[in-house]
């Protein structure tokens, strides 16, 4: 119903937002001048903005919709007759999830995680806005490419482009191999 549509929209939203908008929202949430960021910083000693953790958070938020959409599709493809049969045998919902649903959705989840990882390593906009581009601290491969191109070092930019292409291609090939083995 409406609640599910709301959560689905919220979990998918980072996929359609401009990355700089997502980065700005993260800045507002995690700033030490805001309640959540202040709590993390003062109560737990965790600083997120302009740190390597900020890079991870930004890339994860941007990539999450890919994982979520794949996992959701995998769970939706499960034959409900199998679930109904398990219920008629008296199997608890907890066991149905762990022993039937999760194993049946495993390939979709793995594909989603792999696609999300491939997307996360190429993230630029939200990471730049939220974590910055601090050399040796928060610089990502995508930021490094932009930096060396701006300085005219096309050879280094080419090297880093090849690295990202190789990692992304390896992710896609692994998804195809994993999904191909299941057929």
Region annotations inferred by a language model:
Residues 86:
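The alpha-helix within a helix-turn-helix
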Residues 1-76, 100-125, 148, 157-180:
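Membrane-water interface segments at the C-terminal ends of transmembrane alpha-helices
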Residues 89-90, 103:
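Glycine/proline-centered hinge or cleavage motifs at structural transition points of membrane proteins
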Residues 27-28, 32, 126-152:
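Glycine-rich helix-loop "coupling/hinge" segments at transmembrane-helix boundaries
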Residues 72-83, 93:
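Membrane-helix/interface signature in polytopic inner-membrane proteins
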